[in-house]
């Protein structure tokens, strides 16, 4: 028995007691467990946190926990690093959750980046973290200003507060961080001047303040930071000149000052930056003067040069100097380039991105440029002429080609089928002839823009497995049937202003991702009901104006639940308007940014730099829509035009009463029912069209008075009611009172009102109910008059008889 007891004691001391001894300090373990409990309490279903913090158990050594690092060389085994990167899933938590871990004063590194922490940074809790060397709080929702307590962390070498919503200013106390090597404050709301005290941070290697609200000038003290390798101040409001002594920063590899308000010239000292690899000065409209090529061509390590959007700068290479660098990216868009495409590009064999658009370049597309292994070529908005070299499309490296708005001519080469392009824009040139059938063999073509040329014939059929998402062939001379064969992912089909004819194809119902279909100004026939039945509910914009469609609009129109723009004007439609028009979901509620934006289509192509912005710049017509607005055809050109909601059924033969259900379309901005045969009253429900800006009901047979409810239309700035049979007083409201052009009410039965300076008489101002009441009253008065007359006559007769009888007796 005693042996068993001794054995039990031995096992207890061997196995159980060691489990109670921990390497990390007890108070630090408790702080970590408190943080874990707060996190689990605040975030439900936090599978990431539950899994990764599963090792954080009360009866275990915190030095063995995931995301925790202890000082193995110290006897106390204190926690020195916490890596909480991407721990918290979607769902905001308060910054107070950090308080427990900020009590661990032995921390050297703390990373809470890419979480969903909101609120002010708890500055007071950082006071005791005097050993902290690296602090990463990037990519959260911290707000308020940078707490001054952070500037007391004098051992700090890396401070990253980027991608939050921090405001306020950057204090001059930043000078206290003498050991700081990286200061990263990108994408916040920090404003004011960059403090001159920043020049005291002599150990600084990286200074990135991109996308804030800094103003004033770049402090000259920056030139004292001779160890700097990266300066990124782009997308602020910085003004004045680039410091002349910027050339002192001889270790600089990246200088990015783009998208500010800088002025003056590019300082000559820039040629001293022999280690410079990236120079970005684009979109500073105040920069002026010449760009001496000799300064830049001596920068042997330069790989990225972006000067676009500085239309006051003039490129000068009069010395015909050839560069010593090998660029990978070059953008001189809108830099005053003239003459032929520069010859010095011949030796830029490493070039993958070239943008020389919006200049005054002339001549032909050089064969040597087609031979370079460039991925992205943008030469739009120049004066280039001639035909395209066939070898241009035989380079497997070419992914992006934009030649829009030049004077290129001739036929599109048959070799186009050998290309690997994803984005091809040849719009607004003088290309003619037919489109080669080989174009359908381009394996990964995503966007094709051939609009505004003189192309003719039938458009080729794409294969069902095509990746084509965006097609614009509008404003050409194509004929034959409407193209019907595209890949299943097609979302944009812009085919207006051609000579397409015949009925609408059956297989459009396979385009389940179709968002915009524009076929206006063609010769398409058939019934509108058949056409609408072919469309997916994903369609947001449907423009079929000026075709030969017939029949009535079907009740099934309401199945197009995403529809925001419907233009069926200038066709041969007849019949009544279906009440289901009032059930178009996206015209009832305010529209939001949709898949019509660039991002969903091209965000995955990371090998094409800035493709979203480039497409946005080069494909302006994609964002335009011609509508009948303000009594004429007008172009809605707006990056946000997809926020418009529009219903245009004008110039048809529609008849009957206007359904009151149209008043449900509360987000409608443009409503045009003009030039039809509508009759009856203007619906009172039109007063509920609270967002409407343009209302055209002219050239119909509408009767009655203008509803007083229209006085509620506070956004209305265009109204046309002429050529109807309306009468009575024009309702008064601040908005309607401004619409005082008599022409918008012309040719009606008897409209009056102060807006058109026509006085209203009592008989003109009675509402229908009042008129009925007046008629009933007159009828009652008439009956009363005849009854009174009859009673009077009867009484008179009786009196006469009595009098005569009495007179006889008297005799």
From Swiss-Prot:
Q: Which residues are glycosylated?
A: 46, 71, 128, 143, 215, 251, 347, 376, 407, 430, 499, 510, 546, 559, 583, 672, 701, 747
Pull the Extracellular topological domain ranges from the record: 22-782
Membrane spanning residue stretches:
783-803
Grouped into one coarse class, the protein's main location is membrane
One Gene Ontology cellular component term attached to this UniProt record is: plasma membrane
| Signal sequence extent | 1-21
Question: Could you tell me which residue ranges are on the Cytoplasmic side of the membrane?
Answer: 804-811
Which stretches are LRR repeats? 104-128, 129-153, 155-177, 178-201, 203-225, 226-249, 251-273, 275-298, 299-322, 324-348, 349-369, 370-395, 397-419, 421-442, 443-466, 468-488, 490-510, 511-534, 536-560, 561-583, 643-665, 666-688, 690-713, 714-738
Cellular localization per UniProt: Cell membrane
Classify the protein's membrane topology as the record does: Single-pass type I membrane protein
One Pfam family named in its UniProt record: LRR_1
Q: Which SUPFAM superfamilies match?
A: L domain-like, RNI-like
- Keywords, comma-separated and alphabetical: Cell membrane, Glycoprotein, Leucine-rich repeat, Membrane, Receptor, Repeat, Signal, Transmembrane, Transmembrane helix
Family under the similarity heading: Belongs to the RLP family.
Please state what the protein is called: Receptor-like protein 46
Give the species.
Arabidopsis thaliana (Mouse-ear cress)
